Every structure is written in structure tokens, then in C-alpha cells.
């Protein structure tokens, strides 16, 4: 197995595991990519990622992948303040890699919004955000709830693998 393929497989394995370990899709994807590529995730970024697992719009897995791409190619605040022009090359790379990741989501799930991904996985959007929906979700058969997390774990697995593959491809250029 090539080194690149090994890293992609590691990210996929960690993605499946980390959805539950880190309590959500966005931090799960971010941490799977970070642990695979030795990216440093600080407390503030990790804390912020929880908000992207809140069924608020974009798929949290996509957000976690984009955050990892930002860690890899972004410019830190201190460097940006010293030289605002330093972000031009970084921004161009980020546009290319995030577009590639969005495209993977669109191809696999028909879009990159949380409700589009859920509709592809479950045939409908499962949004336990209102009191009624949360109550109904809590009353679901435990096997169905396990199935829900299993399917969501597959998205985290894919997102982490795609993100690592796209980063490694960009690094080769």
C-alpha cells in the first residue's frame, strides 16, 4: 500500500471512530484529519467546531474538513497582521481544495448541506432540533438510533478520507 493510500485509510478509520469520540461530525472530521496529518488543533478551534455539528446548514463533516484545510494552508492572525498580502497564495489554495471537497459531497450525497446529506442517507431529514422532533427522536427504536449514528459515521469516514486525499494531492503540486 502506498503511503498516500495508507494515510487516506487511516483518516477514514479515525473518522468513523471520532464521530462518537468527539461528540459530533465537525470535530470528528477535523480531529481525524489532524491526527492523520499531524495538524495542531487548539482548544479554541476544537470548541468552535461543536457549533458546526448543530444541524445548522452546511454538513458538519464538510466544515470539519474545511477547518483542517485551513490549518494546513491558512495564514495565522499574527502573520496576517504583519503582512496582509501574505494570504493571497493561501486563499487561492484554500479555494481549490475546498471546492474539491464540496464537489465530493455533491457527487456522493447530492449536495453539501446537512439536510441534503441526511435525505440521501435516510430518505428524509432527521433534525431533532424542535421539542417535538427531539421527543420523537428519543422514542425511536434503539436499533434505528444506532443505524442513524452508523450512517452518520460513514459520512465522517468519507469526509476525513476525502480531505486527506485532497490535501495530499495539493501538496504534490
Q: What is each stretch, according to the model?
A:
Residues 1-18:
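Polybasic, low-complexity association/targeting segments
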Residues 2-5, 29-48, 131-134:
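Acidic-glycine-rich active-site phosphate/pyrophosphate-binding loop
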Residues 16, 48-56, 89-90:
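Short secondary-structure capping micro-motifs at structural edges
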Residues 22-28, 59, 63, 156:
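Active-site nucleophilic cysteine motif
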Residues 26, 31-33, 69, 84-173:
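Amphipathic alpha-helical interface segments
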Residues 36-46, 72-97:
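Phosphate-handling active-site elements
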Residues 53-67:
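Conserved phosphate/anionic-ligand binding catalytic regions in large, soluble enzymes, centered on
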